[in-house]
Each structure stands twice: as C-alpha cells, then as structure tokens.
UniProtKB/Swiss-Prot annotation, chains A, B:
UniProt cross-references to SUPFAM superfamilies, sorted A to Z: Nucleotidylyl transferase
Organism annotation: Acetivibrio thermocellus (strain ATCC 27405 / DSM 1237 / JCM 9322 / NBRC 103400 / NCIMB 10682 / NRRL B-4536 / VPI 7372) (Clostridium thermocellum)
GO BP term, pick one: tRNA modification
Protein name, UniProt field: tRNA(Met) cytidine acetate ligase
Location of this chain's protein in the cell: Cytoplasm
GO molecular function terms noted in the UniProt entry: ATP binding; ligase activity, forming carbon-nitrogen bonds; tRNA binding
Gene3D superfamilies (alphabetical): HUPs (3.40.50.620)
Length: 415, 415
C-alpha cells in the first residue's frame, strides 16, 4: 500500500490537475491519493469559485481517495505558511509515502538542494547573506544573491526562484526537511502555458483563465469551452452548483462588505488587523474611499512591497476580523493540529482506518463534537473557519443557501 | 411675504406630494415653500430610492423654493424625534409662517387639542393615565384610554390615533407647542387610497407602491405607469439617476453588509447598539444566521413590540455603528442645531437672505467649512451623515459613482 499526498486548491478542478494527479500516481507507483485542499478561501486571498464540498466532489470523481481541509489560517497565508501547514498535515496523519508537486523546473533534486541550503543555512551561505544585507539589499534579493554565490553559479537560481510553482515546491521541501519527514518528495514539470494564464488556450488551461472565463460568460449549463479544459465530472459539478445558485463566488462579491467595513474605520483601527504594517493603513483607507470595485480596491493598495495576493489576504483578514493579536495567538502552533475530512471514497475509507491508527493529530469527522472538546486557541481557529463559511455563503445567488452554520450542517462527501 | 414649511421625504416625489404642495400653498396663501426633507436614509429605516440631491431636484421642479436636510439622527428616528427635529428646523430658521401636513383626519383643531393634552398633561388626564398604567396596560394603550376618558368620548380617539399621518401630525403639533412656536399649523385631508398602498392604483398612489413597482419592473427609461402617478419632471429625474447607475437603491442592497456585520458579532456586542434592548440581541443574531434576504432578516426580528420600522432603524444603526453611547451623546441636543441647504431656486435665494438675518441656527452651505468649526458632538453627528452617504453610494450600480466623500463634493442644487 503506497499513499501519495497532493497539496491542492482545485479552483476549479481542470485537465491540468487531472494530468498532475494521474502522472503523480504513475511516477510514484502509489495506489492511494490523499489531497490536502484549501477550503472556501484560497491562498491568493480570494473566495473559491465554488465551495469546498463541491471541489471535494470534483477531486474524488477525478481519482482522489480522501480530501482533507487545509485550515483557513494556513490556506490563506504566504507560500511558506501554506506549504508548511499542508506538509504537516500530510506528515502527521502518518500514512503518506510521497508528495508530488508541480514545478516549472521539474527536477526535485535541484529544488531540494536549494531547500536544504535555506533550511540548514551553512556558514558560508550565511556570510554571503549577511554581506548582501549589509550592502543594503532587500531580504529576497540578498537571499537570491547568496544562493547564487553559495552554489557557485552551478544552478540558474534567478530562473528557478522567479517561478511561483518552484517557489511553492521549495517551500514544501523546506517544510519536509524541517520536520525531518520520511515522506519522499517528487515533482512533475508543469505542462501548462504559463505565458498566457489570462485566457483559456486549449485542453490545459490555468484555473485563473477558467475563472475569468466563467466570470464573463453567462453559461449556466453545458459549455463547450469548459468541456474542453475540464473533466466532464468537474463541469457537471460546477453547473450543478451554479444552477442551484451556490456560486460562482467571486472576490467582487465582497466589494460592499469589505469596502463598507473599511469606510467605517479610522486608519488606527485598520492598523490592528493582521499583516497591516506601518503606513499601509492609510493606503487601505484611501483606497476604500475611492474604489468602486473590489479590483480597484486591491489595485490601489498594491505596491512593489505589497503584492496583489498579499493585499488580498490582508483584506480578507479585515473581512473576517483577524487582528494581529489573533495572528500571534494562532501562530503559537507550528502545525494545523487536526485533520478535517471533507470527503472520501471506498479506498479513502480504508485510508481513514489506517490514519486512525497512525495519525499523531486528531481526525475531525464531526466539527460540532470536536469544537466542544478542543482547547481555546484551537477553538478560535475553528470559529474563524466557521465565520469564513458563514460569510462565503452570503454571496450565493440563491437566498435559500445563505444560512449560517453550514460547517455544522454540511455532511462529509462520500462517493 | 408668507412662507410655508413642509416636512417631507419625497421618496420619490409623486402626484400625491404635488397635490399636497399645491393645496398647502392655496389654503395658507403662502408665496414661498421651504421643505425639510430626510436625506439618503428615511424614517422607515430604509435607504431612499434615489439620493437626496435627486429628490431635491424633484422638489424644486415641483414648486418648492428651498430644501433643507433633516439630519440623519432625526430623519431615521421615531415619529416623535422625526417630527420634533423637523419642526425645530422650520421654527429656528425664523421665517416660516405655516406648517401644513397631510392627515387622515383632516381637522387641525381636533388634532391640536389632542397634542395640547399630551403636552400639557392636565391633572385629570394624568390620573386617568396612572390608573390605566396601574391596571397593567402598556403605555400606548393607557394613553389611548386616558385620552378617551379625558375627552369624555367627544372625539373618536381610537380612529384618530390608529392612522400614521394623524400620529405624525399630532407629533408636529406637540413639537410646535413645546417650543411655543409662532408657526401656524394647517392640515390637509389625505386623498390617497390607504387601504391599498401595496400597488399603484391610479394617479394618486403611495410612495411605497411606486417603490415596489420600480423594484419589480425593470424600466430604465420612459414608463407609462410611473408617468401616470408622478409629475413628468420627477419621472425624468428618476430615470436620469437610474440610467447614470445611481439607484434605484433598496434596503435589499444592504443585505450582505448588514448581515455579515451581525454574523461576526456576539449577542453581547450587538447589545451595544442603539435601541437594542434586552433580549433583542439574541433575536437579531439568530435572524442574521438564518436570513437569506434583508426582508427575511427584518421579518424574523419583528415582534408586536418591535415593529418593522423600528427593527429597520435598529439594523441601520448597526450598519452605521451607532451605539447607545452615541445616542446618549447625540440626544443631549434638543434640536438639529443647524440648517443644511440641499437646494434652492431664485425664490429660495431670497429666502436664504432672510434666513441669514433671522435664523437662530447656523446655515450650512459648505459642509467642509462647517465641520471644521463646530463642536465635537455636532461633529460626530455630521460624521454620521457623511458615513451614511459613503455607505449609501456603494449600492449604486455604476462603480464610478461609488466614491466616498460625496457629502463634500456634491454641489448644492440650484434651479
């Protein structure tokens, strides 16, 4: 029994994801697949286009056996926290043999070598780094330069660390090294066209191009373009959600809620929220005063230092009321602390009984039971998860599905 | 020079308003008309269908000469506060000779007699009242019974005080008496069909039937039904707003903002807001958790004691962050303290120069100047006005008009 772990968002599940899933099984020789998936809000600081239960169905119908939720506090965080949270879950459940991630580079040894340097920080690397920092370079620039020097230019560092999936991959590898995990990392070279993620370009298109297509098309039933770039089961699940009036959910739907919150606050109040560092509160305030759309709001806060995804995560933090204090409290944990099951198939059921034996963290099958018994900090974390969903569902087109408390009422997906 | 004062909402201005305006001029013999009008939020605790500047245009084009804003803290308040705020402004500007209001009863003497009893509280009335309260009657029921006894059944008290415009009229009369105003009150019997305010019934229809019609029809240009029940100038202004994408604004537009705010709060936090008395916080909380629409939210909070309009005002208070503390502070004033000009015509300009000489309260022509010079409590009141508009404009369909600060940038309407 070989178990493969995948770290995913599936927003929504498309042919590229299917390719990755099938190739990963092939190269690992694994016969079971566990996915750790972000929930109703994703790493970019946006709501997912359809909820996590629908995306769980997509994953299971495409070959995943078990889907575990990456808690919001890890899912909607920087690449480093996202990666370490997901890796910790896959490690802590005690049954995963391989992790396979997509990367632009495609060679796990090189990426892992970089991860090793960054985790172990050998003396000469550290002195290169210090030198560059003393020269006035920013931390990322100093790190890049130190890596180049340390590897004696044997690796094309700038090219590798300029690609988002390589960066994320290195973070997975760092996380595995830090916890001395026995999980074997693998990577698959990404085959999608990264030069054009804006538009659907063929059978393999980016998730963002698909979301963009959905936001501009008004398809509510069968759609040629989506059928070309997503597995049929995914398209069916997507339209099942749309026709029920549960989505598509877009960040734009949060314009009134987020902007009105900020318009009501003073810059000093904005300052209290997570990741709002000095000066940014004024940018956020004046952006909310002038912005007519969510996109405008984000764009007018962004700077070179504050990237779009970082700004989006900050705004979602404001939406959910996550203060710097909360963040301090939540980050006292170095791991997600629990594995919440979103769905499984019959093979996943076998995995669950293995996990029950081997996991070092509790398995959460029923949130209402778990929340009663857990400690206060974990409780705050779960309350955040519950609130996030209570706010997410308000964006549904169909009022009948906007009820709060769906984290308690929604059943685990069993396929 | 005779000046007539009208207290209005014009949401939107229709034939019934025109009839009232013209009849009032006729019976008073006045040659000038000053309107005190609620702003972007109205007495029922709802946003106005189009903004106050558009409604000012409607008023001026229908025969009003000067429009003064009733500040939010009075406009979105109980009949008593609404009436006393509006009457105080008309009194304090020092030039108004008559106030003429619509009433179901139509006889100002009878209404004023009731007002006199309620203001002066003669001994025998007071003892009737005490008796009924001691018998366990609610205050409104005890008052009704005491009035019946005091007037020795010479007036049909129950019939009079069961009609909303009589009630409001009595409040105007009470306010005039309390401040010993020299303004002469007049009333006109309302001619609209009160038995059916749900649907447009003819050339005189209620404002709520017109709003309902607009919410269900999708007219964005000329419309037969509206043309039948509103003056042409009003219809034109309405469609000018709609086609620019500034409205129609409905309370339903506030569903995500208000509901998400409440979903984030504990009942204890809800308790801090204005007019939320013991126990209501739990109703509000659970209503927000289950409601899929604003209408549902309101309906599930209402009780016999908490009427729909009261609940709506409470929800708007939560939206704007008005706490009980704020309310205590704001109600330290017994009058609006200033007269903010929304618009005028050439005759209104003449009035303004008279007001400048005779008014006991400052005339606000430029908010940015006034807010700098006023005292802290008044400043809080104005900030509330500014915030209300900053939140109101976010509901516009056209993102270009959603900017904050329109209280500062919008010019006075001069026609």
């Amino acid at each position: 029994m070989k178990v493969l772990g995948l770290i995913v968002e599936y927003n929504p599940f498309h042919n590229g994801h299917l390719y990755h899933l099938e190739e990963s099984k092939k190269i690992s020789g694994a016969d079971f697949v566990v996915c750790v998936m972000s929930g109703n809000f994703i790493q970019r600081g946006e709501p997912a286009i359809v909820n996590k239960w629908a995306r769980t169905k997509m994953a299971l119908s495409a070959g995943a056996d078990l889907v575990i939720e990456l808690p919001l506090s890890c899912a909607m965080a920087s690449a480093e926290y996202f990666a370490s949270g997901a890796v910790r879950i896959l490690n802590d459940i005690g049954i995963v043999d391989y992790i396979c991630f997509g990367s632009e580079h495609g060679d796990v040894k090189t990426l892992d070598y970089i991860a090793q340097i960054l985790v172990e920080e050998p003396e000469s690397y550290k002195s290169f780094l210090k030198e560059e920092l003393d020269n006035g370079l920013s931390y990322p620039a100093a790190r890049e330069s130190a890596l180049k020097k340390y590897t004696a230019h044997s690796i094309n560092i700038p090219q590798i660390i300029s690609s988002s999936n390589n960066i994320l991959g290195i973070e997975y590898l760092k996380a595995l090294r830090r916890i001395k995990s026995s999980i074997i990392p693998l990577t698959i070279k990404r085959i999608n066209n990264d030069y054009n993620t804006e538009n659907i370009t063929g059978s393999i298109s980016s998730a963002s191009s698909i979301r963009k297509y959905i936001s501009t098309s008004n398809s509510t039933s069968f759609d040629d373009v989506l059928a070309m770039t997503m597995p049929k089961t995914s398209v069916d699940i997507l339209f099942e959600e749309f026709s029920a009036g549960r989505g598509p959910v877009f960040k734009e739907d949060f314009y009134p809620v987020v902007t009105s919150l900020i318009r009501k606050m003073t810059p000093e109040q904005i300052r209290n929220f997570a990741y709002v560092s000095e000066g940014l509160e004024n940018r956020i305030k004046s952006a909310a005063d002038t912005a007519g759309t969510y996109e405008e709001l984000v764009e007018s806060i962004c700077t070179r230092r504050y990237t779009k995804t970082r700004v989006q995560r900050i705004l979602m933090g404001i939406l959910m009321g996550v203060t710097s204090k909360d963040l301090d409290m939540l980050s006292r944990f170095d791991s997600p602390q629990y594995a919440r099951i979103l769905g499984f198939n019959s093979k996943g059921k076998q995995l669950l009984s293995q996990i029950k034996k081997k996991s070092s963290i509790p398995l959460v099958l029923k949130l209402s039971d778990f929340i009663k018994s857990c400690d206060p900090v974990l409780k705050r974390k779960l309350e955040l998860e519950i609130l996030a969903t209570d706010l997410y569902v308000m964006c549904y087109k169909n009022p009948a599905f906007r009820k709060a408390g769906q984290e308690f009422t929604q059943n685990i997906i069993i396929m």
